[in-house]
Amino acid sequence: MVLERGPPLEAPEPFPSDGASVPMKFRFPVVIIDEDFRTENTSGSGIRALAKAIEDEGMEILGATSFGDLSQFAQQQSRASAFILSIDDEEFTSAAGRDPEHVLNNLRGFIQEIRLKNTHIPIYLYGETRTSSHIPNDILRELHGFIHMFEDTPEFVARHIIREATAYTNGLAPPFFRALIHYAQDGSYSWHCPGHSGGVAFLKSPVGQMFHQFFGENMLRADVCNAVEELGQLLDHTGPVAASERNAARIFSADHCYFVTNGTSTSNKMVWHSTVASGDIVVVDRNCHKSILHSIIMTGAVPVFLMPTRNHLGIIGPIPLSEFTPEAIQKKIEANPFAAAAQKRHPERKPRILTITQSTYDGIIYNVEMLKELLDGKIGTLHFDEAWLPHATFHTFYRDMHAIGADRPRPKESMIFATHSTHKLLAGI
């Protein structure tokens, strides 16, 4: 994946969501947490009536009577379509032998745990009308609603919850995955590559039958060529492919994002082929990936290398800050006869690209804002090979230590590229 960010420009439009449903039925139950779920009292009968009304509308219910640590239930956020948490008014009375502050802290921790990973899943509290007066604003603002016990029919409340839960699940699939689901479920025959024709080829032999049953029909029907018009084009950046690229650019706070097959190695070569010409001077981390060495050879560029430190065990450390100064880079150019000759032929040209390994296999990363301050306008393109760092933009621990992110100042002149491998560490978050 290639992320690009350049000098200031107009803000991009927000990513539009069509809100259309997906044709496949996915399992996202409504989770109900109520100590009285199976108790023969008013609260128990009310919550069971609501659960039955939801099930009668075709939605699955996952009920629990004892939640223990609410934060453990919060881990269910990736599998649920909504949460309903029952709160009794007596939990806020000292006469019942309970600490109201403990109840609120437990509830607050539950909601914070969910919202830490999922800002959109519907959360409802269920209880008596007077119970809502005990709930502070910081909790209320995170809720989709407070269900007042017996103030409306279970059937009406169920339809409301299902509407919100369905809207949530319909908005989960990003554009390309949504289009792929539609295509695989549409019963379209496959007359192009790959030659297994949607898995039909595997049905002709016993071992093929095993293969088909192991992977499942959906995977094989979705294994299609990039010539499928309904899914858009990787090369032309059209249709659902383009919509997903725009969505990814929004998520990573980039101006543009391009999906690439064959990993970051190919992404690196694409960045170089689009920015570097034969005879251009390039500044390269000596501890670079071999795809950068391939790019140097393929483009005919003239490299000067930034040398990292190395300890007595042979472990490669960071490049000293002194190596990045324009003066140090100029000295390297003058010391390299090929680079010096290239600069003499075109003294008006600055080095075309800087490529830094961010991070190395040993976890060495650099302060990007510091490098931008040093080199913005001194080098045409600042390229960060972030094959092992795609997760950095999503955690404050890495602030300023990755190429592109929210609330980061733009370069004034230089273009910034980040190349990612989503199949390495991105899934780890």
Mark where each language-model region is:
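Terpene synthase/cyclase
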Residues: 118, 155-221, 226
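Conserved N-terminal alpha-helix of the aminotransferase class I/II PLP-enzyme fold
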Residues: 213-266
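Output/docking surface of receiver
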Residues: 8, 63-65, 127-132, 136-161
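Short beta-alpha junction loops
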Residues: 36-38, 125-132, 152-153, 387-396
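Conserved PLP-enzyme active-site core in the AAT-like
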Residues: 64-67, 73-76, 112, 136, ...
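Short N-terminal or domain-adjacent regulatory/targeting segments
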Residues: 1-26
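Conserved phosphotransfer microenvironments
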Residues: 41-48, 67-71, 79-120, 128-134
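Conserved acidic segment of CheY-like receiver
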Residues: 19-54, 59-66, 83, 124, ...
